[in-house]
A protein has these predicted regions:
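Right-handed parallel beta-helix
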Residues: 93, 99-103, 126-137, 157-170, ...
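C-terminal accessory segments
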Residues: 446-514
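Acidic Gly/Asp/Thr-rich repetitive segments characteristic of extracellular carbohydrate-active
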Residues: 40-78, 82, 448, 479, ...
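Sec-dependent N-terminal signal peptides of Gram-positive bacterial secreted proteins and lipoproteins
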Residues: 2-24
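Predominantly extracellular beta-rich ligand-binding scaffolds that present long acidic/polar faces
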Residues: 80, 84-85, 91, 114, ...
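Short glycine/acidic-rich loop motifs that flank beta-strands on beta-rich extracellular proteins
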Residues: 77-82, 108-119, 139-148, 170-186, ...
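Right-handed parallel beta-helix/beta-solenoid
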Residues: 23, 28-58, 76, 100-102, ...
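Extracellular beta-strand-rich solenoid/capping regions of secreted or surface-exposed proteins
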Residues: 58, 62-66, 78-95, 104-131, ...
């Protein structure tokens, strides 16, 4: 939530909502081509073989042909890597990878940053794989320079970023102006900056991103003209702004018609300890108590699925919103996620104030939310903000903390939203449960249902989790959430949080666990 400016089941999951993976293809056998080796003890006058390796990543990138693999031996490479060549569908990708299990480290210590620049930087590239590296220590202390761990930009297809460890990418400058801008960095950034040509068929999987100093930017972001992607099985933690962000309407694409991330899957990720409270881009007096950083955020994206993720100990667990007036986040499905212990709220939707955009035609289904709103601010488990239209909120478990706030919606710009088949529970019992809907407060579960017309089939009961002290929010066999949901196969998905088949009884369970 920028208040200042700014898993393996991929194909099947997307097919459920008719969101295609486009041309994402199964592996193809290619004809033999030349592979290359890089070592800290090598020389760029060598042949690039295992016995006579190159010294620099860049030289290997300059000579690699479609289908080549560049094997990087263990060691520290204080170098940038600029990738402008491409693999091909016929010959295969160009792959950059560590050699066997050796620790190949790309270290930015002392390297300059020019504009927005990745220490690994892909421009208009196609059929490229970057995997198995540790990428670290790329920093700037200068306003309006943006260091990035891996930066993919322009247009391109079939880009895979896998199993990299990215940390200590930082901008430590002092933000400027009334909107506190100019302090920005990313761990991974994919910017579709052309039109109509997009960046498409992007796979970002198995990476770890941590200890990032981001200012008003994000840990892992897709922005602009990006179409067809998967962000799966990543671990993102201990950063000072948003974990995963899908963005539209920021002007990254030269055409407004294409300036929106779309047709993607965010699944199987674990995002935790994400907070803006010590980030001066949200207020220079630290801690600023902004509580504005989402674990997972969709800001103007569309036609995508957020499923089977864990988001906890962040400012906000998951948010689907639009920061731009007159624009909307649309057709996003948030399902089968575990969201717990977040400071402001569990799931938020709608513009964060009445100068923002809207959330339209989205689904929030089969999620488990447990004791979010840990700061006691009253945003509750589900925070329904400005301008929400025609959304579905069903089959979720909402367990409140000490405030007993379940849903908080202070705006009257709320129309066509369907809320039903949810399970609620809180320490004060049904009579003390607090709800705000269309700026009307209701104390008590019965008063809320009769006053709003919501949740005719909802329950107020202890969901009987396995072990909350161990954050195990699976259901005991005696849970009232078992078989108590609404079985709408068009939206509930094929798998639960653990990858087990949905609907094993008479009806779907309420919550993330089947």
């Amino acid at each position: 939530m920028l208040r200042f400016g700014k898993t393996l089941i991929v194909g099947l999951s997307l097919a459920v909502l008719g969101v295609g993976i486009g041309g994402m293809k199964t592996p193809t056998a290619y004809a033999a081509v030349t592979d290359y080796y890089v070592a800290t003890t090598g020389s760029d006058t060598n042949a690039g073989t295992s016995s006579a390796p190159f010294k620099t990543l860049q030289h290997a990138a300059d000579v690699a042909a479609p289908g080549s693999t560049v094997y990087v031996r263990g060691g520290v490479y204080n170098q940038k890597l600029k990738i402008t060549s491409s693999g091909s569908a016929a010959a295969g990708p160009i792959t950059f990878t560590n050699y066997n299990s050796e620790a190949a480290i790309i270290d930015g210590t002392g390297l300059s940053v020019s504009g927005i620049e990745g220490i690994v930087d892909l421009t208009d590239a196609n059929y490229i794989t970057v995997q198995g590296f540790e990428i670290r220590n790329y920093t700037s202390a200068t306003t309006n320079l943006m260091p990035v761990g891996i930066y993919v930009h322009g247009s391109g297809s079939y880009i895979t970023l896998a199993n990299n460890k990215i940390h200590d990418i930082k901008n430590t400058s002092t933000p400027t102006g009334s909107d506190l801008q100019g302090r920005d960095a990313h761990g991974i950034a994919v910017y579709g900056t052309k039109a109509p040509a997009s960046i498409n068929n992007v796979t970002i999987s198995g990476n770890e991103l941590y200890n990032l100093v981001l200012g008003s930017s994000e840990s892992l972001v897709l922005n602009g003209n990006v179409d067809t992607f998967s962000v799966t099985n990543n671990i993102i933690h201990d950063n000072d702004n948003i974990g995963i962000d899908l963005i539209g309407f920021e002007g990254k694409s030269p055409s407004t018609s294409y300036d929106q991330v779309r047709n993607g899957l965010v699944s199987g990720n674990r995002v935790y300890n994400i907070s803006s409270n010590n980030n001066p881009s949200y207020g220079k007096k630290l801690p600023n108590n902004s509580n504005a950083a989402d674990g997972i955020y969709v800001d103007g994206g569309k036609d995508s699925i957020i499923e089977r993720n864990y988001s906890y100990n962040n400012d906000i667990g998951i948010e689907i919103a639009s920061e731009h007036s007159g624009k909307s986040t649309s057709n996003i499905t948030v399902r089968s996620n575990m969201v717990y212990g977040n400071r402001l709220t569990g799931i938020a939707m709608g513009g964060y104030d009445n100068q923002r955009g809207s959330t339209v035609n989205c689904k929030i289904v089969n999620n488990t939310l447990y004791k979010n709103d840990t700061i006691g601010d009253g945003a509750g488990q589900l925070y329904v903000q400005f301008d929400t239209k025609n959304n579905i909120i069903k089959n979720n478990i909402f367990v409140a903390g000490s405030t007993d706030v379940m849903i908080y919606n202070e705006y009257t710009q709320n129309s066509g939203n369907i809320v039903d088949y949810n399970l609620y529970y809180g320490p004060g019992g049904a009579s003390e449960a607090n709800f705000t809907w269309k700026n009307q407060d209701y104390t008590g579960f019965a008063a809320y249902k009769s006053g709003t017309g919501n949740d005719a089939h909802a329950l107020f009961a202890d969901p009987k989790f396995v072990n909350v002290s161990l954050s195990d929010f699976h259901l005991q066999t005696t849970s009232p959430a078992m078989d108590a949901g609404f079985t709408d196969t068009a939206i509930i998905g094929t798998f639960d949080i653990d990858g087990q088949a949905r609907v094993q009884g008479a009806n779907v369970n309420i919550g993330a666990d089947e």
